[in-house]
Each structure stands twice: as C-alpha cells, then as structure tokens.
Regions:
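Walker A/P-loop
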Residues: 126-150
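Conserved two-lobed SF2 helicase motor
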Residues: 205-224, 407-420
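Conserved interdomain linker/interface between the two RecA-like ATPase lobes of SF2 helicase motors
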Residues: 294-363
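A conserved SF2-helicase RecA2
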Residues: 289-299, 453-516
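Conserved RecA-like P-loop NTPase helicase motor core
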Residues: 398-479
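Conserved helix-turn-beta segment of the N-terminal RecA-like "Helicase ATP-binding" lobe
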Residues: 167-193, 386-388
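Conserved Walker A/P-loop ATP-binding site and its immediately adjacent core
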Residues: 146, 153-178, 371-375
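Post-DEXD/H (motif II) to motif III coupling segment of the RecA-like Helicase ATP-binding lobe
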Residues: 246-304
Length: 549
C-alpha cells in the first residue's frame, strides 16, 4: 500500500501524542477505560488525558504511555496485514532572534543536577532522543531559573504556559532577572483577537524569542475555533519548546495542548507536586507521565525547613450542626462548615489566641480561609481587636481591588485557590490553615511550600468535633512527616481553652493601657486617627473588665 500522507497510517507516534486514525471510540474499550473518571455529580464517566475527534475519527493518546501496548490493542481490532504505523519526527522550529545569555550560575548542586537532566548532559545523555521531560523541584528551588537556562542554552523559540495571568508576569520578571533578554523579545499572548492576528500574518508579534500564555487563552480559542488552530499558532510562531508551569494543574487542558502541538520538539513539565488531588485523576496523570523521563531532587535533610504544628480542638457541634454541614457527594461541605465556624465562639477563641501569638512574635503570616464571606468576617475581627493594623492586613482573593498589593501586607487572608501553585509570596514566616479543610496531598504540599525560608512554621487548626476533619488530618500526617522539618500535635481541651481565652484577654487589656502605635505618619494621634477611620471600637484599660464579643 502506498501512503500519501501521514493521516493514512493507522497509528502515528508524535513528539507529545499518539494518534490512532480511522477509528471509533468504542473500538478499544479496555484501553479507553483506563482514562475514565466517574463524575459523582452527573453520574457518568468522563474521559481525562485523551481526546477523540468524531469528525476526523481520530483518537489522541498521551505519548507517555507504552507504545507497544497501544500497538497491540490497535492490532487486535483489525487484520495484522492492514496495520500500519509511523514515527513522526518533524522538529520544525525557529531559533531565538537574539542570543540569550544567563546572568548568574546555578546556586547549588540541585540546580546543576536539574540542568544536566533537562539538557541531557552527563549521565542523562541517554535521554537525548526523548521529547518530553518532567522536572519536579520543591518550591523555591528555582524552576524558573532552570527553564531560563534551558531556553538560553538551546537557543530555541519557547513558550511558557501557566494557569494564571499573574503568574506569567512573575515568569517575565524572573526571566529578565536571570538573563539578558530584552523585554521586547517577550510577548504575552492575551485573548483570541491577538491569536487571530498572528494566524493572519497581521501581527508584529510573530517573530520573538519567548511567548507567555495562559491555559484559559488557549482553551477558549481551541474550543471556539478548533484545536488544530492552536497547533497552527505554534507553527506560525516557530515554537520548538513548551514549558508547562505547575503541570499537574489544568491536566485535561494540558493534554489537549499536547495533542494539538504534537510536533513541538520538546515539552517540559515543571511542578513541585507531580500528582492530582482526585484519586482517579492522579492514577491517569501518572499513566500520562509513565514513560516520560523525570527527576525529583527533594532532600529531606536539606529541603525540609518548615515545622508543622497541628492544634486540635473541639467546636462541639450538635448533631443538627453536623447534619447541616453534610454534602451528599463529598461527605462534608466546606462552605457550610466554614459558615458554621463563623458562628462558633470556640473557633473565635482559637483564632484570637493564634493571631495574638503571631502578632507578638512578629513576622509575615498567611491565613487560609475557605470563603470570601468568612475572610471578611476574619478581617473585621482583626480590625476590631487590632485597629492599628488597618494598613497591614491584605485580602488576596477575587474580592480584593489590588491582589498584588495585598501580597505585600504583613498579614494576608486568602484561600488555597487564590494562593495556589506557582504563587510567589516572599518572606512568609507563618502559614496558617485556619478555616479551610482539605485532605489533598497536592494542596497540602503546595500550602507547605508557601514558606520558603528556614525556621518557618505551618500551623493547622483541626476541629475534632467532625470525624471527617479528623480523617483529613490522618490522611496528611505522612506528608508532614516527610516534608516538614519537624511535626508537633497539641490538643486544646476545655481547661486549656479557658486558659488561652484568659491569656488573650490579658494580652488585649495590656495592649490598650497605652496609646496604640499605628502604621501612619508620626504626627497623627492614635485616637483622632481611630475616629477619623470610623473604626468600630477600641478597648481601654477601664473597659476591659467585661469583654464584649
């Protein structure tokens, strides 16, 4: 048989995808079943990590799975004499328009080892023929630096794909810090109209060295105009290397981009947590990466720098409280539980105690609170008890008018989603899981990785009044035992709770014996400032005998 085009072959192995042509999705039930995820809400199976094009009758599979296994499955559905396969090696890409030089050397052996792996040097030379690489480095170990070195050394036009536009801005600034690249050589692809102009040759942005883009931009354009247009975009830009930042996120979208840009020379999957929160999706993610060369350089003797402190207490929910917080699908509804906490006096005693300790010890702190309404209540509580901190507390969520400015504050209120993977919040001394329960290993490692300096602390408030939360705590213990410098668990019983409540009262009473120091110009008096800002209340020494809640 004479094959006129690559689409005539039954099975084609590309750089980041395996394509099965002229097939139906039902032709390979045992193969497809491995990528199925049961949707508890809609009660159906969704497929993750693969894609089927019904119009062209093409099945796209990840390149990282066993090629021979796929071959056998495909051959079993047809006459062996009719089976045909092809390995596509296009490797069409452009060089950077201007040579990019590094400004600094690797700072330690970890970065040197990661660079040797990414560039297939030394003992990693055997990977030279590979097209996909997984670089798994702990938060703060320099994933952006490694990507910059790879791009600089190879001199190939590249693209960085992240989940958020703000993280792209971090990449831009870090790459400019590490290299001598001109800012004009970095292009941030924003919106479908810009992609359309590039495809129509009406944009001056199609001849640069580095491109930055979010998953959502490519996903929206691919869903609207067809994923083949995304592949055409990469061809137009001459991209030879793509970097997926926090590769475990946006998993299905990453797979679709891999399938659409299947002939890009090399793909680097960069993350600190190479796994998925959902157990079924985690199995598929590991299958997706099964044969992708990877490196994980975590050293517990050196890299573990944050201590873990679990503070257990009992909010004493009534049976009706427990029932009201239930979710038929997931067991416990986080929003309902957090709303319950906002009405629970024991929680507020624990919060006042933890915040007073952090306030007195000094240092920057990040508080995880699961909902925006709860964040506003915690903010009001801080302002009520510590009015002098009016300019030191930031809200880092969608309700904030200036999220980036909020990251510079001394006390930051956020959610695990807002301050998720890839976020850079410098100089944190404390991370406090205050009112956002989770048991995901991925989220646990991400939140633990927010503090990057030595001698920092990760504090978790655990409500043992709900058995689900005790289960969450038990599920995460092994993570802290491995990745934290040390672990400590303390239980606050009723006598202890009364003691810390009294200790907090004394601290508040002593604070208001003297004029408060505000983060304002020295010539503004504290009292007049309080009145000017219309702060609800301040306790003075004569008013602390009866505490107002």
């Amino acid at each position: 048989m004479v094959y006129k085009s690559i689409d005539d072959y039954k099975m084609v192995v590309h750089n980041s995808s395996i394509v099965i042509n002229h097939c139906k999705l039902t032709d390979f039930p045992t193969l497809i079943r491995q990528f199925g995820v049961w949707d508890k809400v809609c009660h159906r199976v969704n497929y993750v990590g693969i894609y089927y094009d019904p119009e062209k009758q093409r099945l796209f599979l990840p390149r990282g799975i066993d090629v021979e296994y796929v071959r056998r499955k495909v051959e079993s559905t047809m006459d062996p004499d009719e089976f045909s396969s092809y390995i596509a090696r296009y490797n069409h890409y452009d060089k950077v328009t201007k040579r990019i030089r590094m400004k600094m050397l690797p700072r330690d052996d970890v970065q040197k080892e990661a660079l040797n792996f990414g560039l297939c040097k030394g003992k990693y030379y055997c990977n030279s023929g590979k097209t996909q690489f997984a670089i798994n480095l702990t938060t703060g170990k320099g994933k952006t630096y490694i990507a910059s070195c790879i791009m600089s050394y190879l001199g190939i036009r590249s693209i960085v794909i992240t989940s958020q536009s703000g993280i792209l801005d971090q990449w831009r600034e870090k790459i400019k810090e590490y290299t001598d690249i001109d800012d004009s050589e970095i292009v941030k692809i924003e919106g479908g109209p810009m992609i359309g102009r590039i495809l129509n040759d009406s944009s001056m942005m199609a001849n640069k060295s580095l491109y930055l883009c979010t998953h959502s931009t490519l996903q929206t354009y691919g869903s609207t105009h067809g994923w083949d247009k995304v592949g055409l975009l990469f061809e137009k830009l001459g991209i030879g290397i793509k970097f997926f930042d926090e590769a475990h996120q946006n998993f299905q979208n990453m797979a679709l981009i891999d399938f659409a840009t299947r002939d890009v020379w090399r793909t680097y999957y960069i993350t600190a947590t190479p796994s998925r929160s959902d157990r079924q999706e985690d199995i598929i993610y590991k299958l997706y990466m099964k044969n992708v060369p990877s490196i994980n350089l975590f050293n517990p003797e050196v890299d573990a720098h944050t201590s873990y402190i679990a503070i257990k207490y009992n909010s004493y929910p009534t049976p009706s409280d427990v029932n009201a917080c239930k979710n038929n699908v997931y067991g416990l509804s986080n929003p309902l539980y957090i709303d319950y906490l906002m009405r629970n006096n024991r929680f507020w005693i624990m919060f006042d105690y933890i915040f007073s300790l952090i306030y007195r010890s000094g240092g920057k702190a990040l508080f995880y609170i699961g909902t925006n309404s709860a964040i506003e209540k915690v903010y009001e509580r801080i302002m009520f008890n510590y009015p002098e901190l009016w300019n030191d507390v930031g809200i880092y969520t969608s309700i904030s008018e200036d999220k980036q400015q909020a990251k510079t504050k001394k006390y930051i209120l956020t959610t695990t989603k807002s301050a998720g993977a890839g976020e850079d919040i410098p100089d944190l001394k404390y991370s406090v899981v205050l009112a956002e329960p989770f048991k995901s290993e991925v989220i646990t490692r991400q939140t633990l990785g927010r503090t990057r300096n030595p001698n920092t602390s990760y504090i978790e408030l655990v409500d043992v009044g709900f058995r689900q939360l005790q289960g969450f705590f038990n599920a995460k213990r092994h993570i802290f035992n491995k990745y934290a410098s040390k672990s400590k668990v303390m239980f606050v019983d009723n006598p202890k709770l009364a003691n810390i409540d009294e200790e907090t009262r004394i601290h508040m009473r002593d604070r208001f014996k003297y004029p408060l120091e505000f983060n304002v110009p020295n010539n503004i008096e504290a009292i007049s400032f309080i009145k000017e800002k219309n702060i609800p209340a301040v306790y003075f020494a004569s008013e602390t005998q009866e505490r107002k809640e």
